[in-house]
Amino acid sequence: MYRKWDLCITRHLLPYIEHSVIPIIALLVLSLIFYILYICFGTTSYILSGIILGAYVNSLFHNNHSVILNIKHPELGEPLKPYQTPLPPELEAPLQLLISKLTQHYINGWYKHVSEDPSFIREVQSTIEYIMRQFYAYVSSQESSHIIYELLKNAISTTTLVLSDLNHFRSKKIPLTEFALRYPESAVSKLLDQASIERTLRAQASAMIVKFSRPEDSACLPLHCLLREVLAMQVFKRITTHCSSPRFVNRCIILYFSSSEDKSDCLAKKNYVNKCLMAKALKDYPVHTNIDPDAGKLSFDDAFYEAHIELHYQFLKEASLNTLIKDKKMLKFIITVRPVHLHVSPWVVYRRYRGFKTLYYLLKKQSARNGRAVPSFPVWRGNTYEKFREGLYFFIEALLHDSHFATNVDVRKFFAKSMRSHPLVDDIYNGFDVDKKHQSSSVPTLPNLTNISRVLSNKTSKSAKPKRSERTGLLSHQSTLAPEPLSQQRDSFELCTTGYRDTGSCTSDDEDSIHEPYRPASTQPTENPPAMPDHNGSPTTEPPKPNAFELKEERLKEIISGGFALVDELCSLNSKLWFFRKSVLTIMKTTVLHGPGRFSAQVERMLKNQIYDKLSNTQLVGDLLTSLILNVWPDEKKAMESHSTRAHRRSTESKISFDSEADSLFEEASKSVPEDPVSVFCDEESDESLRLRAEKTLVENALSENFTLMLGQSTSEESLKIIFELLQEPQFVQGFLAHLLSNALRSII
């Protein structure tokens, strides 16, 4: 993208030093002569040396007294042409449309205010096009079965882990955001954390830039950061934000699970995406797609940093505050936590002296390894209740005002919410303050705050207390009481969803992703990548054609096992007859994998028909990309006009002349979406009616008849209702789509 300064080395000072050793010998002789002159003439030798050196430097000047440095200034001509990988016509138009939108809508919007020179915009546009074409060339050269296998494996594992976490969330019967706050290492917390999502998308964008851009462009850190923000925030995040809106999700549910004749007609005409999926059917209001850069980010990492704390005794009167402490068992506290960097309501936790002391010992043990000093802990002996409370308050303040301790796992668990209304009964079994007498007691929970909790907690008394055999099966499958399994799954979930180290700092994370992108061994390509073009843009070899779709027996069995694990977690959303359904699924899995019939061939044929044929259909993929781009940026044409108007507000022209090339690309891509699509899915409906229609369609048509008979009608309906309520949460869906997109890019790259 940029030109290097051609600084030619002058050869006047040391002529021909690279061709022989004579200059070195001459330098030694001159040093010897200078030493002899110094012995003979003393300090006068410095004056003689200065005269000789001045005469030599004078020979470097022309008549106009300018030093010969031979600096060649760069020539800002046409940008380097990107690698012209032959793209199908169905994919060429979406690529040009996307590049035009990114450059004109994002870069041109702020660059026009500072400069009228379009060279920078052309260079950025050329670089983005180069990356996209290299990405397509790389994907085309890879084995299709390997890519589909990696995509399926990561999607199934991510979905299974999220469902397993939701089963733990269902057992707690608490709102989704509070569950994520109390269990920051869970998969749900990762999906709701906007800062974590942005780090994940930036990491994948950096990996794409490092692998598919020119070496000189990747080495330029300012350009790298600009391209990373364009890909991560303007492409990946805008798409996931648009697709996570409830209206979009409900339209997709109605479309994919509807059995109307219009859908069959669209499928037969291969206009499935154009006429049904996109256009007016999925065009949301602009508020769903606009991203407010000044909006606060929901980050659970900063939940306790600089939080306001109120510390009071639980059963102590004010008149007794000045008395001496006789027994530490009387030190029972009520702590009110008011977060500053997280927009949630304050909560109350109940802790004893034993819990504070345990936290202090844990932090002190960790400080022995990292060398970080822990704030001093007050002594209760010989102190009054008031003095001890002040010392304890200063201890808490010192912890929460230190970013290292405020983000510590033990500190976060200590100040996590207590969802029980009864004092000193904490359902966070972390070793701080566990009252074994009340562990089995039934205490009322606080009112639920979201529709998800209402659906999950809307159980009958019979379903709330499963039978002994069912409880045994539940305990053998997963622990629903202690949060330790969630912490043990942290590494596997981070590897499954991000694949990058979470350093907690955007700067260090960006540097790691720029210089050393993480690429697991399982995702390395099986073949050599296509030959990269030189700096002039001419390739050395053409990328080979994709291979035929064929999966090995081991990979098919792994996909089948993952599918049964996914169904197992889906069935676990309902506790009724869970042990019986688990036994049936185990028998079916054994029959499919080790039975006499070769079911793997049927699975392979299904994957080929449902996934491979659709991904290899360039017309279908091109229509999907075109329609999605036009709906993610619905008012892009108006944005171009406003940007140009602000840039030329001092001009006397009353009419803005647009770039003819951008207009032609926009008109060409707009032809893919008809203005008046004929489809029953394009009827204007209210959000509530659309929601009810989508819920009914999902419950009735999502599962096949055989699968419904195996699970039971009520069981399948209840599980699907829980899934539907989760799909109505935009933050949850956005995080899930972002991690799926990250998994797909990591599998391909």
Curated annotation (Swiss-Prot):
A Gene Ontology cellular-component term: intracellular membrane-bounded organelle
Keywords: Endoplasmic reticulum, Meiosis, Membrane, Signal-anchor, Transmembrane, Transmembrane helix
Record-annotated membrane-spanning stretches: 21-41
SMART domains associated with the record: PXA
Domain PXA: 88-261
Disulphide bridges: none
The keyword Nucleotidyltransferase appears for this protein: no
Membrane topology of this protein: Single-pass type II membrane protein
GO terms of molecular function: phosphatidylinositol binding
Domain PX: 311-422
Lumenal side: 42-749
UniProt protein name: Meiotically up-regulated gene 122 protein
Organism: Schizosaccharomyces pombe (strain 972 / ATCC 24843) (Fission yeast)
Gene name as annotated: mug122
